[in-house]
Amino acid sequence: FNCDYSEGAHERILKKLMETNLEQTPGYGEDHYCGEAASIIRNLCKREDADVHFLVGGTQANMTVIASALRPHQGVVGAVSAHINVHETGSIEAAGHKVLALASEDGKISASQVETLYLEHIHDESFEHMVQPKMVYISNPTELGTIYTRAELEALYGVCRRYGLYLFVDGA
């Protein structure tokens, strides 16, 4: 498996596409399929008042979420191998948000790495002139195929809560 953009579709998806191929529906997320999917998402999130928007790809989704969540002086922390750092054509940085890449041998970053980066930032005498870490981005599974354990996820979440950082969990 390389990525979802380069693989074929499951036969049930192809069957459903063939069944609905000639349906005429409005575009831009205004069709009944998107309406049903949005309703399911709201229900699962237990937020009937939530806005749900569908985007055409992962890069666009990542860029939209990150650009919406961060202020211009804030950046996103991730593994050096994270696809927002390596494969998304610089879209995050093109939107004005630096990717603060942490070294990783297995594609995972640790809570202690994030905490160290954050504390080094706030204790730097010129921190106000530096990109502020505000979001932690992880891929699960990672780009290298490794999976975070529940304990690792809870530790990352704990550090994010402690320091007011957003935690963004994506899939590779």
Where are these regions (language model features)?
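Anion (oxyanion) recognition and catalysis
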Residues: 70, 93, 157, 161
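Catalytic PLP-binding core of fold-type I/II PLP enzymes
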Residues: 148-172
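Conserved core of the PLP fold type I
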Residues: 49-70, 100-107
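Buried hydrophobic positions in well-ordered alpha/beta secondary-structure cores of metabolic enzymes
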Residues: 1, 41, 61, 92, ...
